[in-house]
Structure formats: C-alpha cells, structure tokens
C-alpha cells in the first residue's frame, strides 16, 4: 500500500534541521489531504480536511499562497485531534508514505502529533519521495547546488512525465492528485527500484500490464480556497456591519487641518547602498516643506548622526538669522527651523550572541528623546556590531531592555516584529509582541502605519488599527523614505542592483531568478499635503506626530576633546586638580620633562631658547591640552625602547621646540627658523595635531603598547566612507543597465581626471556651457561637452549618465583610516558608536575623521612608513657585513655625493621624493643645499606646483628667489 499525502501550513520553519519536539519552530498544519492506493496503483481512499486553528491565526502571507483564511478554517475545518486520529488510521493501512519533498510534510505532522501527545508510527515508516537526486538526474535541469542538477518541482516533474503543465495549486488535494499521478508513473517506468519498493522482480511486469497507459488524474473537483475564504469573510463583515465609511469627528478634522507632518522614518546614504538621500538634502527638504522636525533612522548604524545634527544646527542658525532680519525689516519670517531626531532602524533578533544560524531579526525603529537617549542608541548600535554582527548588525530584547532609557519606539515597516508576525506567523503572536514592547516603553511606543499602495501593507494596517484601539497604543504615519523625489525611484533601484551585483532587467521577487527591489515608486520624501491626503481617514496618525516631536529635547553632539588620564609622578600632582578637573599637575610635569629635554638637546639654555620654551609652554597651558604632549612623548619614548624607528618629524609639529625637547621630533625648529604658531596659534587655540611616523613593521607594536596602557575598549581606529565617485557611478550604472563595457569605458574617460572643486556630474549637465568652460582646461572641456551631448540623448547611454548623476556621491562602502587612532578616557562607546574591522579586534568609530575631534575624540596619527623600515634594515645589514654601526640621526646634510643622487633624479625609495614628477624636477633643479630640498618639498603639491619652473629658473640664474 502507498499513502500519498500533502499538507498546507501557516508558513515555513525558522530552522529546517530542528527536531519535531521544537514546537515553536515548526508551523501549524491547516490542511491535509491523502490518497491510499494498493500495490497496483488502484485508489482505495481519498481524504481532505481543513484543520481548525486552535490558539493561532493563519498569517496573511500563508493565506496569500494557499487561499485558506482563519475564518474559512474555523468555519469548515475539524479539530486537530480528529485529523490526527483519521490520519493515524490511514497510516495503519499502508506500507509506504509517499510525497513530493515529503520531509517537510513528515516534520509538520510529526510536530502536530508531538503537540497533541499522540503516538504515531509515521516517523519510522519507509519514505518514497518524488523529489530526489534520481528524479533530478531524470530531468537534468541545470542550477543545482555544487554543479549538480536542480531538484525538480512538482510542476516540472509533471510536465516532464506527461508533457502537460500542472500549476501547483497550493491546495493539498490538488497537489496530492498530481503527486500521486507522478509517483505511480515513476513506478510504471521503473524509476524506483525493487529494493526501494521491497518487491520481487516480476512486480514491475505485472504493474505495467495492469497500467499499460500513462497514468491520468482521477478527476477530483478541487475547491477554490481563496474564493471560499473571500466569501466567508464578506459574510462575516456583513454580520459585523463592517464596510461602512469611517466617520471623522469635527474636532479631529480641525486638529488634522492644523497638524504638521514630519517624516520620522528616513534612510540616508549612511544606509550603505540602500538610499540615495544625502544628509544635507533631507534637512533642506524638510525645511522647504515646512516640516517642524525630521528623523534620521538609518539601517543598523549611526554613522551619520553627527553629520545630521550638525547639518540641522547649521540650517537653523542660517534660518534664524534670516528670520530675524525679516522681522526687523517689518516682514513675516519665511524660514522653517527644524528639530533633528536621531534614531536607528535596528535588527532585533532572538539572541544577538547566537551565530549558529542566520537570524537577521526584525527591523524596529528606536529614536532618542534627548542626549541620554542618544548615548543609549550609541551603545546599542555599538553592541550590534561588536557582539551581534552576523550577516547584519544585530541586538536582541535583552539589549533593548538594558538601554531603553529615554528612547521612543516605532513598530517598523513590514519587516518589523509586529507587522512581520501578522503576515507570516499569526495575529496572536503579533499581539504578544505588541504587549512586550508596550510593557517596556509605555507611552513611548507607537504603532507605525505606512501606505505605499501595497496589498500586504493594507492587511497589516487593518490589524494595527485594531491593536491600537484594543491596547491604547497611538498610531504614527510614516513613509519609510529611501529617495528624495519620486523621479529618483529608478536611480534608487539601480543602487540596490549595485549592492546585490544584479542587472536591473532581472525581475523583482523572491527565489532563484529574481532580485530584491522595492515594490513600487512610493518610497520618496513626500510633502505634507501628500501625506495628509494619504491619511485623511486616519487623522490621529498625523496628529500624534507632534507628540513625538515635543518629547525630543534639543542637544548638540559637539564637545571639547576628552583626553585619557595620564598618570604623573606624585611630586607633580596638585590637589586642586582633583576638585575642579584642572591640569595644573600635567602642566608642571610637562615643563619638567621639557626642561630636562632642553638640557640634553641644547646643553646651554640661552635666554632666547628659554623665552621660546616659555612661550610654547604657556600656549600649551592655555590650550588645556598638556596631557596630549605627555601621551605622545610617552609612546614615542616606548617605541624607541622597543627598537621601533620613529620619524624625525612631519608637518607643523616640527615647529615646536617643546616637541623637540620631549623627543617627539628630531628637528630643531630654532635652528631652521620654523614657526610654532603654525602648530599652535595662541590667538586661535585648537587641538594640536602631531603626525608620527613609525617603521611599518613596528607600528603594530606601538599600537599594542597603547592598547595595553589605556585599555582595549578605550582605543579605536577611525572609519572612512567610500563614496561613489563620478567614474564609478557611471561604470556601476552602466553595468546594471547592461550598457556594453566599451561604451561605459568611453563615457567614463570623458570625465576630467581631477574634478574641479564643487563640481560634479549633475552640475556639468545643469550649468551653462560658459560656466563649464571656465572650470576646465580646453581638452577637458571638449570631453565634458561630448559627455553632456550624450547625456541629452534619448538612449541607453544617455539614461546611464542621467541616473549616474543621482547616484554620484552615494556611500559605496566603509574602510579604516590608514593611520588615525582614537584614545578615550573610558569605554569609547560612552562617547560615540563603534563598529568592528574585518582583520582586527580593535574597535572602529562609526564617526569619520572629519568629525572625530568635534565629537570630543582625541585623534593620533600613527603612520607606518616603509622608508623607515628600509633605513632600519639597511643599518642592520651594514653592521652585519662591515661591523660599522650607523646612526641615521647623525648623517650629515651637506654630503655632495648624496646631492649628486638627487641631481640625477635617483630618488626611488626616498620618502616624498620618489614620484616620477618629483624626479623630473630634481633633475631640473639640481639641488646643492638642504634648503633646495625643503623648498621643493613645499612646492610639490596642488597649488604651488605651477611655480616650480619659475623657482628652478631663478636658481639657475642664481637670482634671489622671492618668497612664495
């Protein structure tokens, strides 16, 4: 006997390898059908049952597939206990259980038997499956795993065996009928072996005699489950009096009319390769639309938080100034000031530490009410990367509970916990989730409703509104924006293709042969009028937005730089420092180290030297950063103790006599008349910045020393943001749109090698020809003119340029600053959010170098220089071969043979003098004194580069150069 069966369920399991005893993992059975056939293929029994959903709902996504609604199953189904009893009787009559990909159905029914505590022999019965490597080899469909043939679907197998299509009905009775036909035909064709069927050899001959023709469907009439669900739902609506138009009170109408809309769920370019919106653009758009606030809620990170708050503050300062001038002139103010709301769309999973299985979690929006809330967001955003990263940055409910202070929550988009459970698991589970969030956040928890004209969204919104009324949770209207204007939708879709390495021609959908994409073009930054029109029947969703705005306190993320505590000897400590946080003791100790160093450097300290040192020490004291110098001299001294080569000094720090006396630099600024004011200006006190060169092999050891001294959680590297440059935007767009490679390359080469300041692709296209011509050299202008002509063509090349101009500047990836290192007084996550590096255990700040100091971070530049390693290795080799011990610090700077090398341009391996351009100018200049090398180093950079020929000519005619 053969029992062929199939089930329809509430969805898919989280883990396919979970045991049937894991009841929470396996979905529920809501329909089962079976056919019992004898060994010759004759039908003995056919049964089909809907199962009453007891204690659960059938989620919408499951209903959309098979058509069985909760209402239909409750009306026409029988209890699970009855179903299991009948199924057990059928199992007792058969030798084999049969199905298409039967393992899933066996687990579903096994889990149901376990839930009900019913014994069954099913799990020990032999299985015959129509979806195996054998049937895959029969059909030989490409695309399987590991280069094998693809496992066939029921439709594919049916079409192969009978040369006629079968549309998988996702109705258990229809699927069982088709599976039975395929199975019996496979038996007739002897695809199953006698060993598998446990039959004698003559069985197949007898089976084929009884069934000489290919098997046919038995002709069952299948119920249209979707139509049946729709019918019963309409009947229930009629009984409940639903379908009547929503009545909005006059009071709500008045409040709605006066209410201001603000976007509270927005993604910027810091949602890497997911949004085309720049931070400045979203602030400008909010102000332009008269919105009182705007939130930034990027996916999984807070990289843009500082830039966002700063952009809003700068806008508000300008708007306030303009409004003040208008009021003073007797006119009405015209500018809108905007309140920034910092948030993050977190991925909240079951256990953020569990990396044994993929669990990207649910997307839920958390927003800060104030500075304390911001720091809690930063903590969570940091943990999401440092502890929870697995495919995506993740946190879990325990982390939310720990850092929930001063936080507001929006329930999120369709991937949020509550909406997702409504669609995929069931309304009961969604309601349980809502209760948890409300228990944690009370009146700071809001249900988020979106209207993008999507069927699944409409279904979710209906349930959310019911939940809102039942649990007294307020609704908030959002639009989950990813691009600024509706016409940017195509460019955004191209960006998603760039992220996933897809062609835009690939259809949007799930599974093999499809790609990810938004379902329509409604995810743009809509105006107040557009949003109010969408929610005219649900005015409270707009009115409630002001409540969130009012809860947010204004705050700045700017702060003074915080230095880690540097331990100074007891004799230099000043008691008052403990009381008021002063740095008197550090100043005393710095003066002591400086004067001791001055004795070693100068021997006799003349009045002019003392005067210079006093001036510098006073300026350093006034800056409030003596600790900075103590920290730097400490790790440089340790580097030398570890035999790590340290550079003699680079940049403006070489102008400091204090730095020279401390051993930070090896250049005497007094001897070379270098200006201290370029390093620290007493009239404009700012954080000093010292670039320190180490040999590239020893840099890591110095880093380890700093980490051990200050603590691993107090040291971090600095993130960099990789932007999509003009040529990159063109090439990426061309690949997605399938523009031929040679054509894309030709267009990209029309872009100037070095873009003029404040120019980009969009400006080239929009500006007048005269303005473009002013910004470019003649040859560059000709190329750009051709580029503009192509952009204005109505073809694929023109479309590529037009879309690329929108994508240009989008963040493409993140990296790590080559030399920047942050040191903080305590755990760095107390100050800024962090992420992690792929090849290092060190934290990486989510804020980049452009805002690190403004955010209060002490930044050091630890540069690894290969040149220092070469010098160090050369010194060792000379000693090894000749016994002569060289000291590079004592090499003369007037050696004629060395200048001869420079004059011939033989400077490969000499830092900052080895480029082909520099070698050419060395040959022209023919340097003879150290001052020539200094001058050329200063000239060889953008700006003064054009004056090099003039400088060379003046030297050649021995005329005194003017100061440049």
Feature map (PLM): residue ranges:
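Alpha-helical scaffold/interaction cores of sigma-54-like transcription cofactors
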Residues: 232-964
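Structural motif
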Residues: 2, 95-97, 262, 293
């Amino acid at each position: 006997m053969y029992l062929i069966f199939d089930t329809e369920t509430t969805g898919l399991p989280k883990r396919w390898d979970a045991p049937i005893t894991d009841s929470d993992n396996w979905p529920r059975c809501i329909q089962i059908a079976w056919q019992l056939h004898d060994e010759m293929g004759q039908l003995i029994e056919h049964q089909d049952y809907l199962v009453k959903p007891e204690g659960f709902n059938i989620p919408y996504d499951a209903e959309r597939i098979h058509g069985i609604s909760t209402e239909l199953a409750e009306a026409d189904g029988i209890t699970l206990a009855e179903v299991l009893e009948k199924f057990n009787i059928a199992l007792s009559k058969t030798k084999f259980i049969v199905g298409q990909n039967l393992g899933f159905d066996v687990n579903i029914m096994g889990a149901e038997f376990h839930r009900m505590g019913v014994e069954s022999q099913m799990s020990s019965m032999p299985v015959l499956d129509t979806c195996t490597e054998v049937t895959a080899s029969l059909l030989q469909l490409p695309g399987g795993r590991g280069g094998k043939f693809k496992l066939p679907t029921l439709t594919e197998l049916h079409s192969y065996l009978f040369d006629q299509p079968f549309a998988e009905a996702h109705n258990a009775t229809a699927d069982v009928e088709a599976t039975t036909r395929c199975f019996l035909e496979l038996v007739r064709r002897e695809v199953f072996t006698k060993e598998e069927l446990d039959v004698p050899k003559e069985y197949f001959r007898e089976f084929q005699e009884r069934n000489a023709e290919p098997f046919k469907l038995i002709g069952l009439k299948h119920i249209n489950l979707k139509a049946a669900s729709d019918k019963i739902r309409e009947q229930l609506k009629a009984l409940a009096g639903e379908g009547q138009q929503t009545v909005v009170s006059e009071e709500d109408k008045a409040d709605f009319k006066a209410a201001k809309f603000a976007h509270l769920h927005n993604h910027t370019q810091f949602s890497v390769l997911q949004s085309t919106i720049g931070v400045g653009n979203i602030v400008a758009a909010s102000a332009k639309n008269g919105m009182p606030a705007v939130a930034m809620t990027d996916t999984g990170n807070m990289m843009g938080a500082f830039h966002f708050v700063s952009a809003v503050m700068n806008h508000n300062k300008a708007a306030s100034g303009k409004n003040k001038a208008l009021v003073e002139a007797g006119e009405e103010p015209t500018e809108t000031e905007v309140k920034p709301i910092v948030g993050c769309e977190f991925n909240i999973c079951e256990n953020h530490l569990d990396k044994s299985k993929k669990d990207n979690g649910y997307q839920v929006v958390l927003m800060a009410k104030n500075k304390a809330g911001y720091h809690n967001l930063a903590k969570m955003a940091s943990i999401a990367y440092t502890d929870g990263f697995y495919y995506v940055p993740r946190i879990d409910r325990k982390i939310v509970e720990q850092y929930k202070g001063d936080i507001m929550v929006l329930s999120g988009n369709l991937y949020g916990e509550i909406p997702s459970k409504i669609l995929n698991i069931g309304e009961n589970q969604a309601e349980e989730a809502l209760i948890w969030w409300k228990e944690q956040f009370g009146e700071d928890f809001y249900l988020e409703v979106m209207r993008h004209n999507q069927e699944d969204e409409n279904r979710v919104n209906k349930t959310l509104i019911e939940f809102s009324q039942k649990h007294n949770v307020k609704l908030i209207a959002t639009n989950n924006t990813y691009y600024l204007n509706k016409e940017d939708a195509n460019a955004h879709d191209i960006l998603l293709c760039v992220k996933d390495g897809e062609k835009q021609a690939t259809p949007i959908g799930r599974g093999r042969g499809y790609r990810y994409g938004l379902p329509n073009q409604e995810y743009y930054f809509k105006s107040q009028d557009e949003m109010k029109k969408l929610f005219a029947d649900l005015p409270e969703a707009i009115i409630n937005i002001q409540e969130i705005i009012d809860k947010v306190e204004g705050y700045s993320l700017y702060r003074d730089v915080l230095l880690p505590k540097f331990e100074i000897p007891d004799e230099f400590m000043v008691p008052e420092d403990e009381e008021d946080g002063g740095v008197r003791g550090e100043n005393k100790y710095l003066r002591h180290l400086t004067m001791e160093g001055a004795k070693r450097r100068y021997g006799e300290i003349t009045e002019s030297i003392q005067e210079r040192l006093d001036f510098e020490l006073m300026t350093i004291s006034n800056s409030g950063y003596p600790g900075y110098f103590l920290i730097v001299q400490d790790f440089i001294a340790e580097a030398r103790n570890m035999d790590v080569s340290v550079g003699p000094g680079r940049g403006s720090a070489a102008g400091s006599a204090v730095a020279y006396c401390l051993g930070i630099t090896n250049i005497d600024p007094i001897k070379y008349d270098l200006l201290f004011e370029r390093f620290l200006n007493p009239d404009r006190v700012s954080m000093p910045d010292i670039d320190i060169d180490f040999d590239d092999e020893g840099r890591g050891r110095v880093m380890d020393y700093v980490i051990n001294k200050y603590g691993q959680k107090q040291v971090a590297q600095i993130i960099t943001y990789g932007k999509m440059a003009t040529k990159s935007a063109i090439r990426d767009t061309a690949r997605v749109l399938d523009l031929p490679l040679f054509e894309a390359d030709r267009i990209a080469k029309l872009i100037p090698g070095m873009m003029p300041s404040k120019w980009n692709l969009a400006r080239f296209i929009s500006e007048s020809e005269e303005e473009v011509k002013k910004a470019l050299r003649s040859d560059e202008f000709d190329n750009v003119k051709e580029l503009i002509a192509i952009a204005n063509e109505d073809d694929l090349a023109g479309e590529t340029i037009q879309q690329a101009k929108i994508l240009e500047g989008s963040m493409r990836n993140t990296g790590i600053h080559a030399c920047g290192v942050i040191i903080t007084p305590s755990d760095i996550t107390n100050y800024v959010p962090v992420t992690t590096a792929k090849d290092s255990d060190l934290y990486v700040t989510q804020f980049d170098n452009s805002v690190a100091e403004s955010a209060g971070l002490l930044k050091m530049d630890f540069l690894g220089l290969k040149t220092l390693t070469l010098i160090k290795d050369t010194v060792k080799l000379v000693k090894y071969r000749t016994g002569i011990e060289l000291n590079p610090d004592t090499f003369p700077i007037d050696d004629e043979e060395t200048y001869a090398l420079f004059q011939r341009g033989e400077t490969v391996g000499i830092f900052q003098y080895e480029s082909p351009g520099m070698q050419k100018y060395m040959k022209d200049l023919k340097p003879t004194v150290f001052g020539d090398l200094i001058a050329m180093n200063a000239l060889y950079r953008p700006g003064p580069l054009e004056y090099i020929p003039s400088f060379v000519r003046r030297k050649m005619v021995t005329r005194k150069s003017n100061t440049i």
